[in-house]
Amino acid sequence: MPQLLLELLSEEIPARMQAQAARDLERLARERLAAEGLLPEALKTFAGPRRLTLVAEGLPAAQADRREELKGPKVGAPEQALEGFLRKTGLTRDQLVERDGVFFATIEKPGRPTPEIVAEMVEAILRTFPWPKSMVSGTSKLRWVRPLRRILCVFDGEVVPFEVDGIASGDLSEGHRFMSDGQPFLVKDFEGYAAGLSHRSVVLDADERKERILEAAKTLCFARNLELVEDAGLLDEVAGLVEWPVPVLGDMDPAFLDLPPEVIRTSMRVHQRYFAVRDPAGGKLAPHFLTVANIAARDGGATIAKGNAKVLSARLSDARFFWDEDRKVRLEDRLEKLKGVTFHAKLGTMYERVQRIEALAGELAPFVRDEPETRTKAVQAARLAKADLVSGVVGEFPELQGIMGGYYAEAEGLDPEVVDAIRSHYRPQGPNDAVPVSSVAATVALADKLDTLVSFFGIGEKPTGSRDPFALRRAALGVIRIVLETRTRLPLKRFVSDEVLDFFADRLAVLLREQGKRHDLVAAVFALGDDDLVRIVARVEVLSAFLKTEDGANLLAGYKRAVNILRAEEKKGPLPAGEPAQAAGAPAEEAALVQAVAALDARLGPALEREDFEGAMTELAKLRGPVDAFFDKVLVNSDVPAERENRLRLLAKVRDAMGRVADFSQVTG
């Protein structure tokens, strides 16, 4: 079946926009093709510095013919209504069909040729493409990320003819801006297109560009007994800057190695898009860097390396100046400047935030580790944790906040635990980032994140959908991970509102789902009013294991049956009060369940009190047999009112007893 190939060639597309642009192009094309009944066998998109490409395999040459039935006026309706319907359909009265007293028209619609639909589709995509930022060029009214230069659109080897703001579609593409002959080349299909680009020094696929960069970079480093410091984010960006990647290894002045390694790496990455290089023996940074050129230089990259080394030297000289100047001022002496730094218009200055975090750290410390020394150090670290925000290095490299504070604290000779807490109080900053494990560092990190959550929820700035401008989901997940991994028994209700506690429940459910655990059980346990995350997760894990057993699954079914009966009765009026009785003449199964519930009631409390959740589940399991037998042999809705009321009391007792372990009504499975 025919193939569609589309290339949108433009000036340089920002690297950060390319991956999303490829996804958007695929989504828009799929939606529009599907709306026209055109379903490709395969569809793939590519993005690079100068081009967006789409290839769709297995498209039909035209739409299938369609038949539509239109409902018209009722038989006997005014003549004007019928005439209007005939004009609309283009039919005569004899061609209408009467059914159930209504006129119907059957319209035969021949399928449109695919190229005609594609032409409309491409123009619509060009005019509605969701670039984060776009521009107009010259007299064109078309908004595109950068000036659009050429549109290649070929279907089944032939040009799909159309024009958008003076740019006519064609069957020509271009190679590398500098390494090709500069002449357009003819394209008939994707295979020829990809081969033509490769022959003209363009690697179409971003993943292939990344593979080439990594492979060549590691080879260069290995030849010099060095090791590349891999950086996935930087690799993604660099692969979006070059069409023909050529790694080049350069040298820098070894004197700069006395700077903190984070400063060197950040200066390389942020300002120059260089990779750092280290000594594989000791793991320390080596006086070298790796840049990725967009051309294969005749001198092997020597001139490129020399020029880049000169630029890097200037950058690192600036960083050294800031580093030297920053160490002349104590962190404590920087606090006054935080009064001039706004944290948020509704939440005051950064100095006020520091005061909140400092106070919160003092309250949290006993729960993390109940020692006076821990509290003293945590309060000191919390007070100084944000002081580096007004330092020169952090002003230049905001991503180093906290890290630089740790270096400055170390230079002042502060306690190592205080240094560590300042350095790591932002952690974890992502799902793969380690949590601070020392008691002082964990306390300060918790205080920082809890203040963020309480403050922003307090002014109504809550995450909605995909929008989370203040990273509150990350903050909540950070609190959860710190608490769980340090086994901190933290009563969250003492520090957060019910709304924030519900938010923690949601994030904990997400975390457990990502770990392949029963996330629905989080709501079932949170419903008990517990706010100790360590205890909640322990209960969830044991409950999850219990529900996988035959006893657990059957008992859950019995619980839901009991609850459904009770809910139906509650709609009629209040349930009978009091305890279920051992009624004379009652069925043996009823008496057995009364005894089983009473025994469970007596043993369940102590097990839960000592947090023996496995023991609690063992006790629950003993209820399964009596519950099954009761429902098999006993009629709850007895004609005898006293019997019926006693059995309803018994079911309520079963519900309440199980409800001490979890709210089983919220369990989905």
Curated annotation (Swiss-Prot):
Name of the protein in its database record: Glycine--tRNA ligase beta subunit
Species per Swiss-Prot/TrEMBL record: Phenylobacterium zucineum (strain HLK1)
Domain of life, per lineage: Bacteria
Keyword Iron-sulfur included in the entry's annotation: no
InterPro entries named in the record: DALR_anticod-bd, Gly-tRNA-synth_bsu, Gly-tRNA-synth_heterodimer
A Pfam family that the UniProt record links to this protein: tRNA_synt_2f
Quaternary context: Tetramer of two alpha and two beta subunits.
Gene that encodes the chain: glyS
NCBIfam families noted in UniProt: glyS
